[in-house]
Amino acid sequence: MLERSQKYDRRLMRKCMAGPNALYLTDELTESMHLEPGMLVLDLGCGRGLSSVFLAKEYGVRVYAVDKNEYASETCNMLKDQGLENEVYPIQADAASLPMPRGTFDALVCVNAYHNFGMEAGFFEEKLRPLLREGAEVGMVLLGRDEGCVKEGDDNENPVFWTASEWKRWFESEGLAVETCEQLKCTERAWKEWMTIYSPSVTEEELEKVKFNPELALIKITGRV
């Protein structure tokens, strides 16, 4: 597992990572997708573009790398260094008002960002679905918690801590025909990678705690519209 993402330069990860390793997350997510060369993919909430680099290099797709933060100029320089300036197009835009016409994209990818902008009821169906072609594929990595941590009587209103089954119900209510929804096998590894890159002095005891924290689950969901 994660053979493809292992080959990337750690200096690139250190420069662009802003959370659990997006290369690992995108690698495992796309194993459950059917991306083909030449497809036009919307990478929404892409941060500094690690997921976009992976999509373009590993699948030969063209990517609109969209994030609301002011990373576009940095991302342009990074893409040039990676030889991807003609395959990945960085765009600074709000997810609620994307400047693309209806039916533009063959697929939507969103890695560890959806909870930042998409949790208003109807958001996916009204704001994102129209941008996708009929039958387009959707793949997301979402923050959540392990199913085994749910106790009887839990009233979990915070979407950041939803389980896979709760996320599945949410997206089905938003019009997505869900095909897979499960916790990522690389969850612990992706979090530890981030911790060691940003805190080189982190102790083994601190790293051990990652595997026991139910609030650090990462959920992958794929489906079609």
Question: What spans do the regions from the language model cover?
Answer:
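Short, glycine-/aromatic-enriched active-site segment of Class I SAM-dependent methyltransferases
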Residues: 140-158
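A short acidic, Gly/Pro-enriched loop at the edge of an enzyme's catalytic core
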Residues: 96-108
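A short SAM/SAH-binding and catalytic strip from SAM-dependent methyltransferases
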Residues: 107-120
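A short glycine-rich, Lys/Arg-flanked "PGG" loop and its adjoining helix->strand segment in the class I
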Residues: 122-137
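Short alpha-helix
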Residues: 160-175
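Conserved Class I S-adenosyl-L-methionine
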Residues: 180-225
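Conserved SAM-binding loop and adjacent beta-strand
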Residues: 11-27
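Class I SAM-dependent methyltransferase SAM/SAH-binding core
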Residues: 42, 48-97
